[in-house]
């Protein structure tokens, strides 16, 4: 009954339950079926009566009444006349809400083309008809006729005729001998006449016959569109409109303003133009006006409809009265202000407030201070209902009055309402999920929100005027989710890396650091205390100091967990700190019996969380905070000018470096080094000096001094602050008391003259000026960075939003191999840190005993990782999101541990969004700059290799020569030195630079820190491999070589110049050859002549006739010139990698293993081919610009994947040559490199999730006997499905190769058109989806938000699962009933249906 009454009030049909949404092109019949009537007049409302005009754009007869249950003339009012149509004004009596739902239409007097299908590239109409857009526009806008039926004439079908040609043809052949038309009618006829099946077959034949790649692609594109129309049920002629739909009037309102004027939606103007022109055209046609006038009117109608659908896409933009472009239907959807992003994905919420935040140190971790005034406003409805329930008010109005007067009982009720009702606090910008957390409110006086100090790191909040917003979760479910999932106490670990994010900072750290200092020689040293009271008494009466070394009887737990006491040596302060540590076997006193820096505290919190659980951690954090604040206040640490200690040796170091710089200047003047080398050396010298001064300063500041009585004095305040991690860093201290050092120009280059002063001494005017560049550039960068970083996050979220954990285990045996990452001999990321919290892909075995440490499929916890480390395992295969075989989402095993909880990941976890946030959130900390070489980038080039381990040397691909100076020199590029420990495990491997001096040989034993090899970081040598006499080839003065006199030194050096640009130099091939005694060019051991090709900018080191030995340098290339490429760093580099762009100077990678051969050169390209080792394969050829330095010689042997030309490799090449695993490793490492430089920790799995999303498409190489088209890109899932189908039917299956798409492209090509349309290029996405008749299965998060459902992640996922189970059960019951009905003969009345609960 209730339902029926409700239906009375709700005349519109409720939204049906649907599983998917399909988009297609609307046919004229469909548009008419939506419509409630035709709009014949352009009028909107009557300006005297303000009533809508009949048949106008706001007509009440078509769209429904303006007031609820009241017709326009007022004859019928009230509910009882519901559904009656007034005979006077023809308006149906119903709810006025129907004006938001009912549509109208306009019958067009002449068909017009839909601009989206015409102009949105590629033009769908053009591709179907195989005509160019230019020709189509000529026909549509009445410039040319098109021949439809040539009849028996000489004209061709679809030939374009101008006006004169048309008339001439009519005269020549007679009027009825052929059919030609003009305008949209013509196109409509052409589209109508298409026989898609025939075209399809014809295209397939043509594709099979063609050899040209370009033609094949063109045919494939057309075939795709033909198939789209064949299979989607769309008819091509529907792309030409004969009826235009009119959207409901309440969606394009006309609002009266003060002063009798009206504000109107732009759509009304656009519709008005269409109606006016349409009516005029109808009238002209009735009047049989001349053709030219009618044609002009048709063209104007076409333009009006174009403007309505997409203003400004063709011709000039139509503007309103105030010269502002009118917003068309397409603009309503597009961009940040469009329907998708403004209203469907981003909604404003009620029950919210915002205020400034202040610190609340006395709060517990789960609390926040909420101003009373604010709470009263936010919780009003709850207060009203509670007042009513208590009988303090009878009506809402009365309750309102009570609340407004702020009566005492209202405050009591507010207390009750707020108890255990969490609120959400949010700080913009919300860069990751920790930007919104739930707290229990505590009422406070004042108007500022109080925030707990420990959650500041998660919100990235500080108290310099930041504001935060408060939201109230209303429903019980919302409160439950807030408490269980979003409470600040449930978010202790950072989702990006699994480290604690509830970490003390600043004052707290300083207080704890001060508390845990140990100083020798203080009064009372060595005393023994039995319990805390005794200790506190001694402290209070100043018998001992906090820092005194004492002994204390500590209550510990043994391995069985039984309590016992032991004597420990510690300080009084550390005992106080130990009191807050939870008692656990795993947490002995040693955990805190050391100097507590920020990092130490973080690790203690981590251990407490791992061993004692969440509740203990929260209590521990709160206590530690109170302790820290209290002791920071007690210590009273501050610093004065004298705390900045300038090292005594500063000026000595500065003077030495000055002389060094002068020497380099002199060497340059004498012509021994080039300008670039001088610059590099000077910059190098000064950065070394700065480092040294900083070291000296740190030594002096951190020095332990003793007073007269032999007790250690308190350590320097500045040092305490920096060392503890409370504030400041060694880099900042260096500027305060050391020397400021080198500064960068705005271009990123480094200025050669450093700033020698520090801030204590003060800068000179010139020094200050030099330092302003960097400071100003920093500010400009920050502004740009924020926008760029936000856009990167948005693209990442979009590409990964449908990545959800949907199952426990996909059962794959694939995985990726993990090793420690070693850079320049130091371990940057240990194996343990990379495999922690991942699932083992196979059994991990001890290399010595071969026993299994971790079983296959086991999640590796801390203890497993420790065991793997102890066993010395070098490589572990783990499961990865990249190799997960689920169709939708990822399985729990492949993902591993949920980093924010430290447990296996739950079903429904939105890992894609978490990954995107984890990568995007630190984006603002990355630099924007592209490093220009010639500065900082060279300084961190390393030029020696030292061993980090002890062991024996094993050399792979060994080729060492002794040169003329009797040094051992590396002669090949792929030589690797490995250090092996006694039991044969490889401890480290080092790739040796070509031309490096070797300090060790095969079989040598090395100690830690011993040099293995060194080389000149500033130049690359060309070495000879044979002994003989030098001769030059094609080194012609002023054509390929020039003697440059260094202007400042007058010394000549010979440099190879660009010979292509000189006259007569095009065919030269400059080289140095080594000849034997007989005057013939010597042969090399690997075949080929001893001829060394030179590249541009090589500096010769030998003369004609010089005698050389193997390993001698013939020429050198200054790295400055070999490396003029920019190193893209920071954010742009991350974006470049995720977008899978080809780097500017991309490396050329060998596709096969083989021998290098130099072919005949072209004018400005050099031809290199690789002869394969395997005779089955074909040789590969590469063309390389001549200016590029090729460091390979004829006859060198390269492996598959080696670089032929140095540079950053293009990710697509890596995928094609080395496969998915290598590509993933490359992308993960490169992206991590950028973040590591900034000290940001991100777990590899996040990057893997994004890379998985980039690898979802397959390019078809051979279509087999399937419906796929070779050369097209198709979803991996679809590819597998179609192949499975073909396999079942016994047909030949298609083959394909994986393609890597950039994140923007991948987002636009997702299976969901809703998601793609709301991301970018809305028009294009919707056009394509409509043509293909795409179905959106509503699987991702975005699509579900858009259609207003729970997202299929988190709680939404479990709800969906329950719904599925329920539907299955219902189906079973119904099937059972049907079965029963068929079995039992109808004659027997006593047969009851199955006794099952009724189905609602």
From Swiss-Prot:
What cofactors does the UniProt entry give for this protein?
Mg(2+); Zn(2+)
Q: Which InterPro entries match?
A: DNA-dir_RpoC_beta_prime (IPR045867), DNA-dir_RpoC_beta_prime_bact (IPR012754), RNA_pol_asu (IPR000722), RNA_pol_N (IPR006592), RNA_pol_Rpb1_1 (IPR007080), RNA_pol_Rpb1_3 (IPR007066), RNA_pol_Rpb1_3_sf (IPR042102), RNA_pol_Rpb1_4 (IPR007083)
Sites where the protein binds Zn(2+) 2: 810, 884, 891, 894
- Recorded E.C. number(s)? 2.7.7.6
- Which portions of the sequence form the region Disordered? 1377-1400
Task: List the GO molecular function terms.
Answer: DNA binding; DNA-directed RNA polymerase activity; magnesium ion binding; zinc ion binding
Its family? Belongs to the RNA polymerase beta' chain family.
* Purpose of the protein: DNA-dependent RNA polymerase catalyzes the transcription of DNA into RNA using the four ribonucleoside triphosphates as substrates.
Checking NCBIfam families in the record gives: rpoC_TIGR
This protein is called DNA-directed RNA polymerase subunit beta'
**Source species, please?**
Rhodopseudomonas palustris (strain HaA2)
């Amino acid at each position: 009954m209730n339902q029926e009454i409700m239906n009375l009030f709700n005349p519109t049909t409720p939204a049906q339950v649907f599983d998917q949404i399909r988009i297609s092109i609307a046919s004229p019949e469909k548009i008419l079926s939506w419509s409630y009537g035709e709009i014949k007049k352009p009028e909107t409302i009557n300006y005297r009566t303000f009533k809508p005009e009949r048949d106008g754009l706001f007509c009440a007869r078509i769209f429904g009444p303006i007031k609820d249950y009241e017709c326009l003339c007022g004859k019928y009012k009230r509910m009882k006349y519901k559904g009656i149509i007034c005979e006077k004004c023809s308006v149906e009596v119903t709810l006025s809400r129907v004006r938001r739902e009912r549509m109208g239409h306009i019958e067009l007097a002449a068909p017009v083309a839909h601009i989206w299908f015409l102009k949105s590239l590629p033009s769908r109409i053009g591709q179907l008809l195989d005509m160019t857009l230019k020709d189509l526009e000529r026909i549509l806008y009445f410039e040319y006729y098109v021949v439809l039926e040539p009849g028996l004439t000489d004209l061709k079908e679809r030939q374009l005729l101008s006006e004169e040609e048309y008339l001439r043809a009519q005269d020549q052949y007679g009027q009825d001998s052929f059919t030609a038309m003009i305008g949209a009618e013509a196109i409509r006829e052409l589209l109508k006449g298409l026989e898609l099946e025939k075209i399809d077959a014809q295209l397939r034949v043509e594709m099979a016959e063609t050899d040209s790649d370009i033609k094949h692609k063109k045919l494939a594109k057309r075939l795709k569109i033909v198939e789209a129309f064949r299979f989607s049920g769309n008819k091509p002629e529907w792309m030409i409109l004969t009826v235009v739909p009119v959207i409901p009037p309440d969606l394009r309102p006309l609002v009266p303003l003060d002063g009798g004027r009206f504000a109107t939606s732009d759509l009304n103007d656009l519709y008005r133009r269409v109606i006016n022109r349409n009516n005029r055209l109808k009238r002209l046609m009735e009047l049989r006006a001349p053709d030219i006038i009618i044609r002009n009117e048709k063209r104007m109608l076409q333009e009006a409809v174009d403007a309505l659908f997409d203003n400004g896409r063709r011709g000039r933009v139509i503007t309103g009265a105030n010269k502002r472009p009118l917003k068309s239907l397409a603009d309503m959807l597009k961009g940040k202000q469009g329907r998708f992003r403004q209203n469907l994905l981003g909604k404003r919420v009620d029950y919210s407030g915002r205020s400034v935040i202040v610190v609340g140190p006395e709060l517990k971790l789960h609390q926040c201070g909420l101003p009373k005034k604010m709470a009263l406003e936010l919780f009003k409805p709850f207060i009203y209902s509670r007042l009513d329930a208590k009988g303090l008010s009878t009506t809402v109005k009365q309750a309102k009055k009570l609340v407004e007067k702020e009566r005492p009982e209202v405050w009591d009720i507010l207390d009750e309402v707020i108890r255990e009702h969490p609120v959400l606090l949010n700080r913009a910008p919300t860069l990751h999920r920790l930007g919104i957390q739930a707290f229990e409110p505590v009422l406070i006086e004042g108007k500022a929100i109080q925030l707990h100090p420990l959650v500041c790191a998660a919100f990235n909040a500080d108290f310099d005027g930041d504001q935060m917003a408060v939201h109230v979760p209303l429903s019980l479910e919302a409160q439950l989710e807030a408490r269980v999932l979003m409470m600040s106490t449930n978010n202790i670990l950072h989702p990006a890396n699994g480290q604690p994010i509830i970490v003390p900072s600043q004052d707290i750290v300083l207080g704890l650091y001060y508390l845990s200092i140990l100083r020798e020689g203080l009064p009372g040293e060595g005393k023994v205390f039995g319990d805390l009271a005794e200790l506190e008494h001694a402290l209070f009466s100043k018998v001992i100091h906090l820092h005194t070394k004492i002994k204390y009887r500590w209550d510990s737990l043994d391995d069985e967990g039984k309590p016992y006491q032991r004597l420990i040596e510690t300080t009084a302060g550390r005992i106080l700190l130990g009191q807050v540590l939870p008692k656990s076997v795993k947490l002995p006193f040693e955990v805190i019996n050391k100097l507590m820096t920020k990092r130490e505290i973080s690790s203690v919190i981590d251990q407490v969380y791992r061993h004692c659980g969440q509740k203990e951690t929260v209590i521990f954090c709160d206590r530690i905070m109170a302790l820290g604040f209290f002791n920071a206040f007690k210590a009273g640490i501050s610093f004065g000018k004298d705390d900045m200690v300038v090292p005594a040796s500063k000026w000595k170091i500065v003077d030495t470096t000055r002389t060094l710089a002068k020497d380099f200047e002199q060497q340059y003047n004498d012509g021994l080094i080039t300008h670039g080398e001088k610059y590099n050396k000077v910059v190098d010298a000064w950065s070394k000096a700065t480092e040294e001064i900083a070291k000296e300063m740190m030594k002096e500041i951190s020095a332990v001094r003793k007073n007269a009585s032999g007790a250690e004095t308190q350590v320097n305040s500045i040092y305490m602050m920096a060392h503890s991690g409370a504030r400041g860093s060694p880099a900042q201290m260096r500027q305060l008391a050391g020397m400021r050092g080198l500064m960068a120009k705005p271009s990123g280059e480094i200025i050669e003259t450093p700033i020698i002063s520090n801030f204590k001494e003060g800068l000179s005017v010139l020094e200050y000026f030099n330092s302003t560049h960097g400071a100003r550039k920093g500010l400009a960068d920050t502004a740009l960075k924020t926008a760029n970083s936000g856009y990167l996050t948005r693209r990442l979220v979009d590409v990964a939003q449908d990545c959800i954990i949907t199952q426990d285990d996909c059962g794959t045996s694939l995985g990726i191999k993990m090793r420690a990452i070693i850079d320049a001999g130091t371990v940057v990321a240990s194996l343990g840190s990379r495999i922690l919290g991942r699932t083992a892909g196979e059994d991990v075995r001890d290399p010595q005993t071969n026993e299994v440490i971790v079983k296959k499929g086991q999640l590796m916890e801390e203890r497993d990782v420790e065991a793997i480390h102890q066993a010395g395992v070098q490589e572990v295969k783990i499961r990865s999101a990249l190799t997960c075989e689920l169709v939708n989402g990822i399985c729990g095993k492949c993902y591993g541990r949920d980093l924010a909880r430290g447990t296996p990941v739950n079903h429904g976890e939105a890992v894609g969004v978490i990954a995107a946030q984890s990568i995007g959130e630190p984006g603002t900390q990355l630099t924007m700059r592209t490093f220009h070489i010639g500065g900082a980038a060279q300084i961190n080039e390393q030029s020696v290799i030292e061993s980090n381990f002890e062991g024996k040397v094993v050399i792979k691909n060994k080729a060492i020569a002794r040169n003329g100076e009797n040094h051992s020199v590396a002669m090949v590029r792929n030589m690797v030195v490995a250090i092996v420990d006694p039991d044969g495990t490889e401890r480290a491997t080092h790739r040796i630079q070509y031309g490096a001096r070797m300090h060790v040989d095969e079989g040598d034993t090395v100690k830690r820190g011993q040099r293995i090899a060194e080389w000149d970081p500033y130049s690359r040598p060309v070495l000879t491999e044979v002994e003989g006499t030098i001769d030059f080839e094609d080194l012609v003065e002023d054509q390929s070589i020039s003697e440059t006199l260094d202007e400042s030194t007058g010394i000549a050096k010979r440099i190879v110049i660009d010979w292509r640009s000189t006259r007569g130099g095009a065919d030269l091939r400059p080289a140095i050859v080594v000849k034997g005694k007989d005057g013939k060019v010597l042969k090399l051991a690997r075949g080929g002549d001893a001829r060394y090709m030179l590249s541009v900018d090589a500096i010769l080191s030998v003369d004609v006739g010089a005698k050389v030995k193997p390993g001698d340098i013939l020429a050198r290339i200054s790295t400055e010139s070999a490396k003029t490429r920019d190193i893209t760093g920071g954010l742009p580099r991350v974006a470049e990698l995720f977008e899978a762009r080809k780097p500017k100077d991309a490396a050329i990678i060998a596709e096969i293993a083989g021998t290098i051969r130099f072919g005949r050169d072209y004018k400005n390209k050099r031809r290199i081919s690789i002869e394969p080792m395997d005779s089955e394969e074909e040789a590969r050829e590469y063309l390389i610009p001549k200016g590029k330095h090729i460091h390979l010689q004829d006859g060198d042997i390269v492996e598959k994947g080696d670089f032929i030309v140095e540079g950053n490799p293009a990710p697509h090449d890596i995928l094609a040559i080395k496969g998915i695993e290598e590509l993933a490793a490359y992308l993960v490492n490169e992206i991590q490199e950028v973040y590591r430089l900034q000290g940001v920790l991100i777990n590899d799995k996040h990057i893997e999730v994004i890379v998985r999303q980039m690898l979802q498409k397959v390019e078809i190489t051979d279509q087999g006997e399937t419906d796929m088209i070779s050369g097209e890109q198709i979803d991996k899932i679809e590819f597998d499905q179609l192949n499975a189908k073909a396999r079942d039917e016994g047909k030949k299956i298609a083959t394909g190769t994986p393609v890597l798409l950039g994140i923007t492209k991948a987002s636009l090509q997702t299976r969901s058109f809703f998601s793609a349309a709301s991301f970018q290029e809305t028009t294009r996405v919707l056009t394509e989806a409509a043509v293909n008749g795409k179905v959106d299965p509503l699987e991702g998060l975005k699509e579900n938000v858009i259609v207003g459902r729970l997202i299929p992640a988190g709680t939404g996922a479990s709800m969906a699962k329950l719904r599925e189970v329920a539907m299955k059960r219902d189906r079973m019951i119904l099937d059972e009933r049907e079965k029963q009905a068929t079995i039992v003969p109808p004659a027997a009345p006593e047969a009851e249906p199955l006794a099952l609960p009724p189905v609602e």
